[in-house]
Amino acid sequence: MTLQEIKDQVLAGFDISSAQATWLANMADSEALYAAAHEITITCASHEFDMCSIINAKSGRCPENCKWCAQSSHYKTQAEIYDLLPAEECLRQAKYNESQDVNRFSLVTSGRKPSPKQISQLCDAARLMRKHSSIQLCASLGLLNEEELRALHTAGITRYHCNLETAPSYFPTLCSTHTQEQKLATLDAARRVGMDICCGGIIGMGETMEQRIEFAFTLAELNVQSIPINLLSPIPGTPLENEKALSEEEILRTIALFRFINPTAFLRFAGGRSQLTPEAMRKALFVGINSAIVGDLLTTLGSKVSDDKKMILEEGYHFADSQFDREHLWHPYTSTTDPLPVYKVKRADGATITLEDGRTLIEGMSSWWCAVHGYNHPVLNQAAKDQLDKMSHVMFGGLTHDPAIELGKLLLPLVPPSMQKIFYADSGSVAVEVALKMAVQYWYAAGKPDKNNFVTIRSGYHGDTWNAMSVCDPVTGMHSLFGSSLPVRYFVPAPSSRFDGEWNPDEIIPLRETIEKHSKELAALILEPIVQGAGGMWFYHPQYLREAEKLCKEHDILLIFDEIATGFGRTGKLFAWEHAGVEPDIMCIGKALTGGYMTLSAVLASNQIADTISNHAPKAFMHGPTFMGNPLACAVACASVRLLLDSGWAENVKRIEAQLKEELAPARKFPQVADVRILGAIGVIQTERSVSMAYMQRRFVEEGIWVRPFGKLVYLMPPFIISPEQLSKLTSGVLKIVREM
C-alpha cells in the first residue's frame, strides 16, 4: 500500500481499514502524512471554522473515579467547589461569547448527573438564554436518560456532549465506576430526542497509538460529526499527574489519523492545547483541526478568542455570515434551535452553483424546479436590466403596462384553448388560493352558494398558505400539524396506476363515490395533473384525468389543475394536461414562468368562469395582491417564455429523460431502493426508509452535486440546459450516496 492510494481511497468516499491506519501511523515521512491529511480536510471537511465556548456551571466533587479528572472525589486536587450558577450568569457569559462570534455555548456540570431540581434549573437557564441570545446551546451534564434529555432539548439545547474519552479496550484501565456502554446509551438517547451529539476524548493518558486508532474508528462507526480532541494536562493529585506529555509530532500524527478515519467531521481542539507552541498549533490547523473550544476550559486555562480567530483566519479558514444566518434567519422547513445546515453561495452560472469556499456543485434541483434555463442567463439578465431602466413596479389596480400585456399574449397560445382570462399572482401557493377563491365565488355568482368545498386526492401538495394547505394530504403531508384548524376537505386515494403502466378502471371508484355523495357542496376538484410533486413525486396514469373530467362535467363541479411544478416542459409536454388531453376550468402556473428569476404566478380561467363572477354582485373578483402584475417580473417572464420556446426545450427534455432512465437504472437493484421512476426531466429514487436530509445533503455536496432529498425520496429536476457530462456527474453521485445508505 502507499500513502497516495490510501488518500485517494478516502477522497473517493471510501473508509480505510484498521490495517491501513496502522500503516499510516508507522510511516516515516510525517510531513507527507500531514500534507495528505490536509488535502482530505480541504476536500471533505467544512472550511467554516466552528467555535464553541463552555461554562463550568457547577463544580464540585464527583463520585466517579476517572483518573484524569480534577473534580473526582477520589483524589485530592485544588479544583473549585461551587453549586449551580444562576441562570443570569449563564446568560451573561452566553451573550459575551455571542459578541465574540462564537457559534456555540455549552453548559457543563461536574458529577455523574444533575439532580432533578438541577435539571429543571438548567432548563430554565436554557430558556432564558434562548430568549435573550441566539447562540446555539449545548450541554455536557453526565449520564442522562431520555426523559431528562427531552426536557433539555425542549428548553432549547440542541447538542449533547458525552465523551467516550478513549478506546473501548483502554477505558476500564482509567475508570471503573461507569462504563462506555452507559455513555453510549446517553448518546443514543440524545439522538432519539432530536439532539446532535458531540463525542471525543483525551489523548496522552498512557494509551498506545493503536488504541487511538481504535478510538477513532469507534467514533466513525457512531457517525460522530463533532469530535473534541483534548490533550492531557496532568493535574496534581490525580493518578495521571506524572504522565509524560505527548510530543508535538505524536499529537499531529494522531490528528492526521483521526482525519483519515473521520474525513468529514469537525475535529475540535479542546483542553490542553495551550501546551503547544504557536507553530505546532498552526500545523494542527493545517493537518485537520477545523473546530475549537475557545476561552478557558473546565480546570485548565484556554486561550483568548481574539487570538484564536486571528490564527484560524491566517490558516485559511473563515467565519462566514452563516453564523448570523443560523442565529437570526429562519429557513424553510427547519428549526431555529437546531437548524439544518446551509451552504453559502457565492454565485451561480448555468447548471452550477459556486459555494463561498470555492466548491462548485452541479445543480440537480433547478432551485425547487423553477430555474429551467439555469443561472445567470444573459437573455434574462438583459430583460431585467432593460425593465429596471423603465419601471420596477406600479400597482396593477387601475394601471396596466406592456410587460403584463405582452406576457398574456405569449401565454394564451400555450394553454388550453378555453383559458381566456389571466389573473397574475405572487407565488404558486397564492395562485392556488386564488383558484380556490375563484371557484367559490363562481358558484356563489351562479346561485349555488352551498357549493363551497373541495375534493382532491391523497399525497397531493398545493402550497403552504392557508387554503392551499387544506387541499394538501392531511395525513402524510407536511401540514398535518394544522389539520384541526384547516377547512375540512374531501380526500380520496391517489391512483396507483403508473404513468407508463396499465390503467386499472377501479381506481376512479373512490372519486366517483365521493363526488356522487357530496356533489351539492363541491365547488371543484383540484389536482396536480400526472405528477404529484412534493407530496410524493408519483407519476400516475393519464386516464385518471379523463375519468375525473367526466365526473366533474356530469356532476357540475369545476376542475382545477395545479401546474405550478409541471408547467413549462418539465414532464416532456409543455403542460402536463396535454398527456391526457383534458382541459380544466381553472389552471395555476408559476415556478418556471420567470425562469427562476423572480416570484410570479398566474391563474388562468375560462370566459364562463370570469363572466359569471363578473356579472354578479359584487361584479368583481375579490383578490388583489400588492405586487400583482409586477412589471419587472412580467418582463423577465416574457423573456423566459420566449427563450424556452426558442431553445428546443422538447429535445433537451427528451435527452435528459433518456439519460436519467439509463443512468439511474442500476439503483433498481439496490436493496435500499423501493422504486425508480422517470418522466421527462424528473428522476426519482424512492428508498425503503426515510433519509437523513442533513447527512445526505452534506454527502451530496462532498460529491460536488446539489440534491435536496426528503422523506424517502432522492430526486433530480435539473435545468434543461444541463450538459450530458454534468448530468452524469449528478446521477453517479446520487447512486453512490444512495448505495451508502
From Swiss-Prot:
Annotated EC: 2.8.1.6, 2.6.1.62
Protein name as catalogued: Biotin biosynthesis bifunctional protein BioAB
Assembly with partners or alone: Homodimer.
GN (gene name): bioB
Superkingdom per UniProt: Bacteria
Biological processes, Gene Ontology terms: biotin biosynthetic process
Disulfide bonds: none
Keywords for this protein: 2Fe-2S, 4Fe-4S, Aminotransferase, Biotin biosynthesis, Iron, Iron-sulfur, Metal-binding, Multifunctional enzyme, Pyridoxal phosphate, S-adenosyl-L-methionine, Transferase
Reaction(s) catalysed by this chain's protein: (4R,5S)-dethiobiotin + (sulfur carrier)-SH + 2 reduced [2Fe-2S]-[ferredoxin] + 2 S-adenosyl-L-methionine = (sulfur carrier)-H + biotin + 2 5'-deoxyadenosine + 2 L-methionine + 2 oxidized [2Fe-2S]-[ferredoxin]; (8S)-8-amino-7-oxononanoate + S-adenosyl-L-methionine = S-adenosyl-4-methylsulfanyl-2-oxobutanoate + (7R,8S)-7,8-diammoniononanoate
Cofactor note: Binds 1 [4Fe-4S] cluster. The cluster is coordinated with 3 cysteines and an exchangeable S-adenosyl-L-methionine.
NCBIfam families, A to Z: bioA, bioB, PRK05964.1, PRK07986.1
Species, as recorded: Bacteroides thetaiotaomicron (strain ATCC 29148 / DSM 2079 / JCM 5827 / CCUG 10774 / NCTC 10582 / VPI-5482 / E50)
Site (Participates in the substrate recognition with KAPA and in a stacking interaction with the adenine ring of SAM): 333
Modified residues (N6-(pyridoxal phosphate)lysine): 591
